[in-house]
Amino acid sequence: MLERIKDSFTESIQTKIDAAEALPESIAKAAEMMVQCLLGGNKILACGNGGSAGDAQHFSAELLNRYEIERPPLPAIALSTDTSTITAIANDYSYDEIFSKQILALGQPGDILLAISTSGNSGNVIKAMEAALSRDMTIVALTGKDGGAMAGLLSVGDVEIRVPSNVTARIQEVHLLVIHCLCDNIDRTLFPQDEQQ
């Protein structure tokens, strides 16, 4: 059991090393897109299932409240938090539409969708991306494995941040780190701080 625990740490470290080589450019591009979105008076919508729903909520909380510096709140909405809306849509229509219907109601041109799926194949996240495209929103896709069907929906103006791993737990661990990198870049760009602090 102890060896298995150590192996989990080692795998996680190696996945982060691989991600540190593969992902910085796409993370920086996504952060810059988010900064421009926010400067333009727009908002970021985020969605995912299970642990990815938790990541969407984590990202939105960091923007709405604060990350590491005191600053004004920034507009971000996690689409996985309203159980009445989610269960109504799932019951009356389909679970695949729980995010897309919210995007059709809330999304505006210039907004960004942060679409999170470790496999890239979550049906409701794919539908969310399709709805975002119909609203002239930009997409930042946080994926893993081979990018799945989500990768095929992205255009030149969108960004995929694909974790170089096939292990769901390792992908989720890097997704959280990516979210923190995005928040850090957004904060430091919008609210430059003295590096001594």
From Swiss-Prot:
- What Pfam families has UniProt attached to this entry? SIS_2
User: Which cofactor(s) does the record list?
Assistant: Zn(2+)
**UniProt keywords, alphabetically:** Carbohydrate metabolism, Cytoplasm, Isomerase, Metal-binding, Zinc
What's a single GO CC term here? DnaA-DiaA complex
How are cofactors bound according to the entry's free-text note? Binds 1 zinc ion per subunit.
Other known facts: The reaction produces a racemic mixture of D-glycero-alpha-D-manno-heptose 7-phosphate and D-glycero-beta-D-manno-heptose 7-phosphate.
Belongs to which family?
Belongs to the SIS family. GmhA subfamily.
- Report what the protein is called: Phosphoheptose isomerase
